[in-house]
Structures are given as structure tokens and as C-alpha cells.
Amino acid sequence: MLQRVDDTRAFAFDPRGRVESTETPLAPRPVALAGLRLGILDNSKWNANKLLRGAAEALSGEVAFAAVNYYVKHSFSKDATPELLARIAAECDIVLTAIGDCGSCCSCCVRDSIALERLGRPAACIITTEFVKETQLTLVALGMPGLRPVVIDHPVSSITAEEVALRVGQIVQQAQVVWTA
């Protein structure tokens, strides 16, 4: 509530608040991807499975991973549980998460990636072009502005098999850079 304390001065209330966070460094990046264990975190959003399985297959054609482990969280509008994140960090060296193509799922996908980075696992978070600004705001607010997302064309939920394949190409091209750069 805004109260007038002094009749000679006017005060303005700024409802935006202030975001203060401590910047967290990214997880150490590997020099090469061959021989690493790839983790796939599917947030169960429409077409996330198709995108992630397609990306895993395409990436495995380019990189000799030691293993590819697939995990599903059953709510795209909630963060992954600490137990699931700990399991992924224990069983994988790098992680691919998807999909951020709406407000809540994008926020949670980004938050999952940040949590994995804090557990020491480079994470490539797939978002769509419509949510780049929101992703950057989330990364800054949570103290990891240096985490680069994998950005694919929007939309995702209502696309054809051919469009899925095009987006898989975008993922493959960017994810390797996110993990190693």
C-alpha cells in the first residue's frame, strides 16, 4: 500500500520489483562428445517425444555416445523433481531437454536445464522462437545468463512429420555447440 508520508513530496510505487540473483557459472564443458552419456529429458509436451527421439537418433549418427538415456517427466508445467534431476546427473554427462513452446513449459524446461547445470551437467534446453525473450529473462533472474538455449521454429505442437524433421536438424546443429562452447 502506498502511503503519503510528506504532503510536500509525491511518491511513486514501482510494481515491477527488483530481481536480484547471484550469477552461477555454467557446468564445465567437455572438449569432445564422443564416449559421453547423453541424457534426454522429455517434458511430455506434444511432439517433444518426436523431436527428442529424432534428435537423439541424428546426434548418435554424428557422435559415438557411450549411452543414450531417456527420461520423462509427466507434467510439462512443473519442474522436474530433485530425485529425477539427481538421477539424470548421476547417469549422464550431457543433457538435452524439451520442449519450451509455451509460457509454463518454457519456464520449467529452462529451470530444469539450470538445475542440471548446477549439478555439473551441460544442458541444452530446446525452446521455440516465440519464447527467446522470456527464456533470457528467466536465465538472468535465476543467475545463469550465460546458458544458451537451442532455438527452433515455432510452433511445435501442430506440425507435420516433415516439419519435425526440419526442427530436429535445428536441434542437432545447435545442441553440440551448447554442450561444448
Residue spans of the language-model regions?
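Helix-enriched interaction subdomains in cytosolic or periplasmic regions
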Residues: 1-17
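Structural motif
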Residues: 23, 75-86, 164-165
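Glycine-rich phosphate/diphosphate-binding loop of Rossmann-like nucleotide-binding domains
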Residues: 36, 40-57
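Short beta-strand elements in bilobed, periplasmic/extracellular small-molecule ligand-binding domains
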Residues: 61-74, 146-153
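Short, well-structured alpha-helical segments in soluble
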Residues: 81-93, 112, 171
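Active-site-proximal loop->helix
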Residues: 110, 118, 132-145
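A charged, well-structured terminal subsegment
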Residues: 150-181
